[in-house]
Amino acid sequence: MQTLDQLDVNGKRVLVRVDYNVPIKDGVVQDETRVTASLPTLQHLLARGAALVLLSHLGRPKNGPEEKYSLRPVAAVLERALGRPVKFIASLPSSEETRRAVESLQPGEVALLENVRFEPGEEKNDPELVEQLARLGDAFVLDAFGSAHRAHASVSGVAGRLPHAAGLLLHNEVEALSRLLHDPARPYVVIIGGAKVSDKIKVIENLLPRVDRMLIGGGMMFTFIRARGGQIGNSLVEEDQVAYARQLLEQYGDRLMLPTDAVAADRFAPDAQTRVVPADRIPDGWMGLDIGPETARAYAEALQGAKTVFWNGPMGVFEFPAFAAGTNAVAQAVAELGNQAYTVVGGGDSVSAINQSGQASKVSHISTGGGASLELLEGQLLPGVEAMK
């Protein structure tokens, strides 16, 4: 990939595609992680004499501009984080008004444009929109790893029209995740959780031949347990994936580790009645909503001595405190490896768990890209990453 050092930015207007797709409630940004993650690239470019024009999407607006999807609240957060004024340009990124506002920027100045998904051509990678966006800068930097798997106008489209490079965040993400695919230090342990096998099939398929152990948790565990003939009560199961899970167990049974116990509930609610039962004997009318304490201990033990670890997806219904113990135990076990192992955590709930455990600093890499991380680990080429080559 082309790196920032290879790009001439002094006195230039640099269009930077960032990922500010952040949760906003009542006009207030709830989580600033993605804004903070973009700072090293922005500071690097400013220090080298660039003026910055920032592009991002927010949410999935369906009918053009909508107030709740405006990036205006993000401008205030960015201004505070950068320690310099950020000019918010409320007109559509493709408009003449925006072009005029951007042309007046001086080196060291920063402008944040309105949500690029307000443009109907963004997700279609419309050539006309690509041209209009390319006019806003002399060079282009892609730093939105979370959007790198999208062939959109502001991601891969503009890259074809301007001198370009990968930002520091994008570069670090690709390097960090590639280490999980190419010559990882062993033992290599992967923890996969979440509700559905179908969401993670390709990652499981691509990683299983490479790992020493794969620990399964979350709702998807019951599809595997059903494949082994277990009783799962009312637990979540994907019937159309049972045969596939059975095939994986036959082929990789020595590497796949399944829960031996589960926290079962009489209904899906935070205040449900609970009991710990064998994972393959969930009583009728009950549902498994977390891995049990015996499994949590076994998984922590399986992680001891690992040299490479990747964790994606919660072990249970992490939003309900009664079913968060499994996820928290895994967060603790991953963090305790410290610098004895190369550890990567990706996926919203796993990242939340590691942050809440107060142990995030002990993890080698926390990935900001949900779908993009998974697609890279599936062995797919990401349009944004390919465009930076």
Swiss-Prot record:
It is found in: Cytoplasm. It is an enzyme of class 2 (transferase). Its main location: cytoplasm. PROSITE patterns: PGLYCERATE_KINASE (PS00111). Pfam families: PGK (PF00162). The gene is pgk. Pathway: Carbohydrate degradation; glycolysis; pyruvate from D-glyceraldehyde 3-phosphate: step 2/5. This is Phosphoglycerate kinase. Monomer. It comes from Deinococcus geothermalis (strain DSM 11300 / CIP 105573 / AG-3a).
